[in-house]
Amino acid sequence: MTAPTANTPMVNLTIEGRQVSVPAGTSILEAAKTVGVLIPHYCYHPGLPVAGVCRMCLVDVEKAPKLAPACATSVAEGQVVNVHAEKAREARKGVLEMLLINHPLDCPICDQSGECELQDYTYQEGRADSRYREPKRFNPVEDFGGDVMYVPNRCILCTRCVRFMDDIAHDAVLNVSERGDRAYIGKFEGKDLTHPWAGNVVDLCPVGALLSKDFLNKARSWELDRTASVCNGCSQGCNMIVETRDNVVVRLRPRPNNQVNDFYLCDYGRLNYRWMNRGDRIEAPTVTSASGQRAADWDVALSSAAAALKGKRVFVLASPSLSNEALHFLSRIVKVAGGKGAFRMPTGPEAPLPGVEDLALRADRAANGRGAELMGFERTDQPLAGLSQGDAVIVVDHDLTPDDAASLSHASAVVLVSTFMPAALARADVMLPIANYVEEEGTFTNLRGHVQRFLQARAAPGMARPSWYVLADLCNALGDRQDAMTAAQAFAALAAAQPAFAGMSYDGLGLRGKTIAGATAGQASLEVAT
Amino acid sequence: MGFPFTPHPRETTVLSKHFGDAEARTLDGWKARGGYRALEQALGMDPLAIQAVVKDSGLRGRGGAGFPTGLKWSFMKLGDGKPHYLCCNADESEPGTFKDREIMRWTPHALIEGCAIAAHAIGAETAYIYIRGEFTEPLDVMERACEEARRAGVIGKNAMGSGKRVDVWVHKGAGAYICGEETALMNSLEGKRGNPRIKPPFPAAAGLFGMPTTINNVETLAAVPPILVNGGEWYKKMSRPDNPKSTGTKLWSVCGNVMRPGNYEVEMGFPFKEFLYDLCGGPPKGRKFKAVIPGGSSVPIITMEEADRALMDYEGMVAVGTMLGSAGCIVMDDAQSIPRQVARLARFYAHESCAQCTQCREGTAWTTKILERMVAGDGTAEDFDTLMSLAEDMTGKTICVLSDSCAAPVVSGLQKFRGEFEALITRRTVHTVPAIVA
Amino acid sequence: MSHGPSATGGSAISTAPNGHSSEPYVPVFTGETKARLDALLERYPTKMAALLPALWMVQEARGWVSPEAMAETGQVLGLTAAYVKGVVTFYTMYHQHPVGKHFVQVCTTTPCHVCGAEDVVKAFLKHTGCGELGVTSADGRYTVIEVECLGACGFATPVMVNSDFIESVTPEKVPELLKQYG
């Protein structure tokens, strides 16, 4: 189906008694979604070419001689679709029974349990028992390489994984091998699922046939708490869900957003979560005086920090993965005190997902380089260049090279606002513990200027506070009045002060984000040029 | 003729006239027998005029579906600027059917001529003849005939000096029944797994290589040259007076428990009883006919009572609850166990399922397992209901009709020969091992 | 291809050795074979369309389609090895393992079944010394398999030995027939 344009005529039909009006060429399945009717399906996925093979989405279309596969049937004017007609339900019941005849029914030891579409639809409309009395087919578990394990006995051959690798990843390492009921998902010996985006086949698999080796036997899906977030592994800003069990992040999964990442998350991003749970955190504010480093309460620590900074030129070394809000308050400090803000950008090889326009694991391996630049921070390999005697430095969640540490020795004061203690740091006059980004709310700006919210997925350790909250307090302690009791207030302060964000509101961003005005135009012309 | 036997006087030999005549295989021999006159004529005609003659003849597809050939050709949008393709379906693999094999073995030029005419009629410059890999001799004969025709300029970039390009290529299959399904054949020709495609789009809109394509059976295409030479009216006359919907002659492959198995060419509407007893010589000595599958294994089984009143055309077979299909007639005598044969058929379909649709992949295998268990003496009364319910799930719900084809003989077998299945169950052995309950 | 006691017999995932030898792989598509493939490519608008013919060339040259040959064929036609494997395993005529010098296929589908094809199979298993379907005889000369409908139902039972198509085989004719295939 080609994407509808403004000129595509609308088609009117009735689905489950509801009036539906959708662009011509829309499938019945997608049309039904628009009025809140979910037609059961397995092989269909909106991001993949239609296969029409599972036959689970059969629906009754009045006056049609046969049941229609809703995924592969386009809407027609005046159509009356009965999803729950007796014969459609019977047909789907038959499909469900057949999908289970060779299935090991091993839900108690299956990772997919609880988020398995085979379970869901069987509960919803399957048979209570099975009439199958013959021996079951058996095939051994296979390691597909990468993070993927294949359990063929649970496979329903929907071919979503094969189509993803063929049509989206453009790396056809999976196939359907053999035919009839001997068929299975196969690969070629020695050619593994090592594509940087291959892990998506695990999410695409509607059943427990493709599993993440990383997540294997880690948690039952119903024990997980799920939080909408944004990946900070690179500047793409893929939308994701952070899944925690007992305040521990155990899995990251993509959250669909067709403006940014479609349905996908790369392997680098999805496996980049262990640091979120790290135990060696700074948990309490400290103040260093002649008598040594002491824990302090927040008020004392903040006023000590302000005292250390007051009247000096301030250099800010800020992580490019800080939120827009935190960077904004830091930019205030730089502006008031004079000095400069800078960051070093970690990089790695770029890895595009060719089947989706403008989607890649980006070379810039931090979430908010664009935000930092918009806020006046300089991207440089020598972030402390120009630091002179008497200047003060604030290091905000930024790791330090030995050279950085050497430069810091010239500083008159060092304030560390961080989740962790940089190994190379010799001294800090004040240390202020902050939450990492999955422990707080905030926004990132991706490389195309798309501003997106992330929510709090776990509790911060000890006395750590959200970064923007701490930095707003520091502004206040320095006499620059900032109001940021909530993330929304912090964003409002940012939007009021930073021209790029003018007119945006925290609520207005929603969970899919908004693009900075003018930011995409440049990109569009760039795309045309290439 | 009832090849390999001498023709029966009641046969009407149009396509089979030269079966067994080795000289007819050569280009010169074919020309001497009137060959390529039709092509010469066709190349000078407007494609629409050719379509009109074929429409007028009433020729219907001989591969099984019986779709009117001229109408199918007319779906091709001429002059749309896209390359058009003709596919000749020579993947004859429907159990019981072996007529296309003889056409290709004995009259390869009849097929090439038919292909070239059809290609011109649908605006195609390329025709592919997809022959199943097991047909080593027909492949060889067709390859040689194509080469001969190409060398002589009968086909190629200036076919018969007409200035029109008609390439005809032979493409060898590699062992898959389902590639006889038209869209599976196209996938196979494109170098893919032979998976049937979802329709729409239909081949005339997006077929081979995504381009407008017409696909015709060997026998259909071989019938085109005589129709063009003799006119549609001539062909139309070969039919029952009361049924103008089935016209022309039809090759019937007859096999199984019959005295003279072979290929017979009769006019549409021929009485089936006379056909089986007179032309085919009746049952083997001392035996009686018991059942017939008249149109290839995918059509319902009929009893002899039904067969005796059947007329051999599309409508005549439907009237007795079966179909003409590919006219592959499998005859079974009273020594055969229907459950055993139905189980064997089911196994065939389970083996050949492409694995795409759930009902087919799982249903054909499950049906086979139940039937084989019943035949082994371990059936239960519930198996009847399960088989019928599976057959319902397997009918009309999948991309292609392979699973329907598996269900048809099961349902008709159970309905018409239920006693034989029941006998298996009443005699059944006692379970010594508890059944595995899913 | 399933030859087990049920239609679903046999494990789908093959763990059998593929007859790998330590010798380096010698490419199929060189010289004259490559020229034949190149000529063939002109018949089709896509390279992929030449996959089935190319695999036939491999089987002609090597007697079977080895994993290395799948990879090579893929490379020549711009396809991944996994894709080629998916295609190879779909079609029953490509051998995924080495077979005997003479590959015997006996049709046993319904029309032949009613004419006693099972006995023909038994005769072949006995006289070739294979004993079992799909097993190559100890002397490496024969492999016998059952095959689904060969499309010569009126000439029951048709048998293919290598590329020879033999009609109307009965159990009695088997020993004489095998003499031609030493």
Language-model-detected regions and their locations in the chain:
Chain B
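Hydrophobic alpha-helical positions that pack around
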Residues: L139-M268, C280
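Ferredoxin-type iron-sulfur electron-transfer modules in oxidoreductases and energy-metabolism complexes
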Residues: R37-D56, K82-H84, A90, K99-M104, ...
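Cofactor-/ligand-binding subdomain signature composed of acidic, glycine-rich
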Residues: M1-Q51
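Short amphipathic, charge-patterned alpha-helical segments
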Residues: G114-A118, M268-K285
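Short acidic, glycine/serine/threonine-rich loops at helix termini
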Residues: A65-W73, T97-D100, L139-R144, C179-G191, ...
